[in-house]
Amino acid sequence: MAVERTLSIIKPDAVAKNVIGKIYTRFEDAGLKIIASKMVQLSQADAEGFYAVHKERPFFNDLVKFMISGPVVVQVLEGENAVLKHRELMGATDPKKAEPGTIRADFADSIDANAVHGSDSLENAAVEIAYFFAQSNIYSR
């Protein structure tokens, strides 16, 4: 099995609920190491740049507005099959469809305020990680 890295964002709704530690515990209990982390308040330009791939989608403006509504916690996770493992921990995008015990089932309110973001592929993970972190600020352990 390959050791991978993936980007994870704890979104404004989950930060406001003060469940950062509970989400971190789930990452670590699943064998994912947090190798970089920071809390940031995204600007409109930051959010638009990060989600540029969705620019033509009908939900783009609402997504950007939501992501700048409060601070987020951005982290790099590392571990065996990190991309898939993180996506399984998150659960379905719509929390109503998420399996019980997943982050979104337990902490998300709606398809928009869905607690977490996670890279959907290794290729996107590399791009997303570089968007938020210089290589010199990532510490494998």
UniProtKB/Swiss-Prot annotation:
Quick one: which residues bind ATP? Answer: K11, F59, R87, T93, R104, N114
Major subcellular location class: cytoplasm
Native organism is Methylobacillus flagellatus (strain ATCC 51484 / DSM 6875 / VKM B-1610 / KT)
Keywords, alphabetical = ATP-binding, Cytoplasm, Kinase, Magnesium, Metal-binding, Nucleotide metabolism, Nucleotide-binding, Phosphoprotein, Transferase
Residues of the active site are H117 (pros-phosphohistidine intermediate)
Q: Name one GO cellular component term.
A: cytoplasm
Q: Which reaction does it catalyse?
A: a 2'-deoxyribonucleoside 5'-diphosphate + ATP = a 2'-deoxyribonucleoside 5'-triphosphate + ADP; a ribonucleoside 5'-diphosphate + ATP = a ribonucleoside 5'-triphosphate + ADP
Instruction: Tell me which NCBIfam families the record gives.
Output: PRK00668.1 (NF001908)
Tell me the function of this protein: Major role in the synthesis of nucleoside triphosphates other than ATP. The ATP gamma phosphate is transferred to the NDP beta phosphate via a ping-pong mechanism, using a phosphorylated active-site intermediate.
Location(s) in or outside the cell: Cytoplasm
- InterPro entries on file: NDK-like_dom, NDK-like_dom_sf, Nucleoside_diP_kinase, Nucleoside_diP_kinase_AS
| Family designation | Belongs to the NDK family.
Q: Record's Gene3D superfamilies?
A: Nucleoside diphosphate kinase-like domain
Tell me the domain of life. Answer: Bacteria
**What name appears for this protein in its UniProt entry?**
Nucleoside diphosphate kinase
Q: Name one GO molecular function term.
A: nucleoside diphosphate kinase activity
Keyword Cytoplasm on this protein?
yes
Q: What is its EC number?
A: 2.7.4.6
